[in-house]
């Protein structure tokens, strides 16, 4: 069994495509069930954020599983396979693990080094675990990715600026609203989830004068407003139906609801700007961080209104990180990947070693029974001493080769040593499977038609070509 990753992100697709493939919290369990019902998939985890959707699946056949995941994404998004392949990327086996470690470290984020991705991976893993969709392979992969991400953030300065999508958006907004930035101004936060909480925290640090939290359920909005009040900021909680009235008071609006359909409409915005008492010259900056987008496109055409969406924020210089910090993070990812892969290879050879020792124990017991039949008068103390001696001899003979094969198997390409051990000692597949957990078994995948270059996969199968680049340098297709 190996891990297959199929993803679409801000690096390979424009916002309209990301909106189509976006997976909501409601969608995730349904799609996970569909993945598990597929012929070639035994484990599944879906990572979905405001700028990426990635499906991690443990598969027994690369081509078949790739076709199944691709068809599921096409059906979910409404995109045909031709359109989807232009924006999708594929990683397999070691390359899939490397990619997840980089994502968890913030190296693949729109804002390099942001920490929110760790929580999003944790959410994806918890959701998969709750559906019993994560077996040994995904448990170990996800847990190791979270550990790698934490280590990168604690040992490098990649997040020293505390940057996030929210901070970049609000920093841009501060420069638009006028002198003094956000200090003393009024902000509306739509949505009381993690992005809403992050927005309130950043607005508070920026010296905002007043925060209005708007949410479908007022109780959750009130909880977030209480957080703002606890930090000395005047705050109010409103239901979503009261959004136009709240907008009439706002200098800045931040929205990220994950809703299907516009939350901030042209009609509501026009009505808010026309409210008595609002200065016609007063700018309104709307930060649309939702995927799908929360703001109707026509809103950006209104006089005095600036809409900052994910596409415009992606071009912001503040989204970068210092080269030295990014290099240090990549070094950690590479080291952790090597350790993880060594552990995985060792786990693959362990059942073979166990089967060999079991085979030796069976031979010893058979020979002792033969001894009993030939020397029935042997008393118990003598028989016990003979048994101990034979077992010691066998253990000493097996110790060096089994320790050495574990060492060799943990190195890249080491799977051949386990195969050699099975061949030399005539260990049948059944005898190895008998001492292995079902999730420990390594599946045989025919990779003869697959060329893995720089972590990317290219091949001759037409289903494969729908989703991968034919660029031999391993660059994702942007066509």
Swiss-Prot record:
Signal peptide: none annotated. CDD domains: NAD_bind_Glutamyl_tRNA_reduct (cd05213). Pathway: Porphyrin-containing compound metabolism; protoporphyrin-IX biosynthesis; 5-aminolevulinate from L-glutamyl-tRNA(Glu): step 1/2. The record marks 99 as: Important for activity. The active site is at 50 (nucleophile). GO terms for molecular function: glutamyl-tRNA reductase activity; NADP binding. Its EC number is 1.2.1.70. The keyword Ubl conjugation does not apply. Substrate binds at residues 49-52, 109, 114-116, 120. Gene3D superfamilies: Glutamyl-tRNA reductase, N-terminal domain (3.30.460.30), NAD(P)-binding Rossmann-like Domain (3.40.50.720). Keywords: NADP, Oxidoreductase, Porphyrin biosynthesis. It comes from the Bacteria. It holds the Pfam family GlutR_N. NADP(+) binds at residues 191-196. GO terms for biological process: protoporphyrinogen IX biosynthetic process from glutamate. It catalyses: (S)-4-amino-5-oxopentanoate + tRNA(Glu) + NADP(+) = L-glutamyl-tRNA(Glu) + NADPH + H(+). It is an enzyme of class 1 (oxidoreductase). Homodimer. Possesses an unusual extended V-shaped dimeric structure with each monomer consisting of three distinct domains arranged along a curved 'spinal' alpha-helix. The N-terminal catalytic domain specifically recognizes the glutamate moiety of the substrate. The second domain is the NADPH-binding domain, and the third C-terminal domain is responsible for dimerization. During catalysis, the active site Cys acts as a nucleophile attacking the alpha-carbonyl group of tRNA-bound glutamate with the formation of a thioester intermediate between enzyme and glutamate, and the concomitant release of tRNA(Glu). The thioester intermediate is finally reduced by direct hydride transfer from NADPH, to form the product GSA. Belongs to the glutamyl-tRNA reductase family. Catalyzes the NADPH-dependent reduction of glutamyl-tRNA(Glu) to glutamate 1-semialdehyde (GSA). This is Glutamyl-tRNA reductase.
